[in-house]
Structure formats: structure tokens, C-alpha cells
């Protein structure tokens, strides 16, 4: 059996990545912040599931996770660096400590974990890394003004790392979901925005499937979502930043 690591596996896109990698025959190391990660094995059958509860916004949490991987004494074939969060609201009002926590999870923690994963896979000259970023990487993100840049960082990181890892036989793919029906926007305190309703958003199972298909096809990136999402991403590559910022604010600006 091959082994796959998925961060943010207790919910949403990460949960679907874990479930679908299990269906593809991978043993799973699934990571989440809260105790609900311990239920992951109830949803995946026929493979080994190792749940890890760790705070990936901290160096200690990353080292705790990596110690689990090392104790398994098995090669890691797939790593999905997926855990992330947002914080909605006007930058004037949002809490700085919460923003710094988000940067610690979405950027610093990802880089810390990637360092371990990349060295491990380069030693073996094999492996595949899927980095979940966002269509928000393609636009300014008013009312999520720190979140969007964290996704741009991860997209640029993924594309650069991909080039470096080619000579080691390690693949790197970026998954850019459009708005997806998960806990994400509620957790970000965005219930009072258009993004706050899950009614119109993409199915996380579809987004995960597209990510995994692109990963195994060796693509550099993939937009996650339906045709409208892919059309919107293509449009965003042509519009000016001020126009995109106004368009994004229509969905992210609090209505109350
Ligand atoms: N949903 C969207 O519209 C959307 C669009 C574009 C990109 N994305 C990206 O997709 C990724 C997954 O988001 P999602 O929509 O699936 O969100 P979600 O349903 O809220 O799931 C977030 C996952 O991350 C885990 N997590 C949160 N903070 C953590 C921490 N400090 N340490 C370890 N794990 C932590 C959560 O664990 P607990 O459940 O235990 O808290 C959960 O498993 C994110 O990187 C996000 O930027 C989402």
C-alpha cells in the first residue's frame, strides 16, 4: 500500500481528498486541528487511517505531525498540503492576532511542512505534492484582504517548487478551488456575505477529484469547480486588478 498525507482532512476539500485517496488504495495520514479528525477512519474503509490532531499553525504542531510520519517508517507517496482558513471583514476592523494566526497556518506552517516533505521525497526520488491554494490567488480579495495574498503566495511557491523538484522525480500541482460548499466561510465569520451561503458553491467532492486527477496527470495547476468557476478564473486572467477587486467585493463585503 502507498501512503498519503492530507492536512485539513476532517472537513471539506481535505476530507474529500482523504476519502478519494483511500478509494484509490492509499493508506491515509489525516490531520486536523480538533478532535473530529479521530472520526476520519469511520468514513474510509479498506485502508489504514492514521488520524493526527495537531495545530499546524505552530512549529510544534508541524514537528508533532512529522514525528508521526517518521515513526511509520514508510515512504510518503502523496502529500496534500491543504489545511487553511480565512478571516472575513474590513481590514480596519479585523483582529490582528487572528490575521497573524491565519498567516501562520496558511503560509508559515505550509512552508515548514513542505520542507520536511520535499527533503523526504527528494531522498527517494519519487513523490507527488498537491498544494491547495485558491482562485482567490488570481484576484485582489477585499474583505478577505490577508487571506487572498496567502493563496497567491502558495500558488507562486507551488509553481516555483515544481520546477526545482523536476530533477528529483517529484511532482508538484496547485489546486485552485473556486467558492466551495464547506465550513470555510462560516469559520471565517463570513455568514453575512454572498460567500456565506453554500447554496451556489462547488461540490467539495468534485473539487477534490479534479485536484487528484491533475496531480496524477502531472499538471502544474488545476481550477477546482464547475464550468462557471473555470470561466470566471479565465476572465480574471484578463481583467485589471481594480476591476477584479470591485467584482470580488460583491461577494465578500458584509451585508449587515
Ligand atoms: N471552501 C472554499 O470556498 C475554498 C475556496 C478556495 C480555496 N479553499 C482552500 O481549501 C482549503 C481547505 O478549505 P475547506 O474549504 O475544505 O475548509 P474547511 O471545511 O473549513 O476545512 C478546514 C480544515 O483545516 C483544518 N484546520 C484548520 N485550522 C487548522 C490548524 N491550525 N491546524 C491543523 N488543521 C487545521 C480543519 O480542522 P478542524 O475541522 O479540526 O478545525 C479542517 O480539517 C484551504 O486551504 C482553503 O484556503 C477553500
Where are the predicted features?
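Conserved glycine-rich Rossmann-like NAD(P)H-binding loop of the short-chain dehydrogenase/reductase
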Residues: 24-40
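Residue(s) in the substrate-gating loop at a strand-loop-helix junction
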Residues: 134
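Substrate-binding pocket helix/loop in short-chain dehydrogenase/reductase
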Residues: 90-92, 98-103
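Conserved glycine-rich cofactor-binding loop
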Residues: 10-11
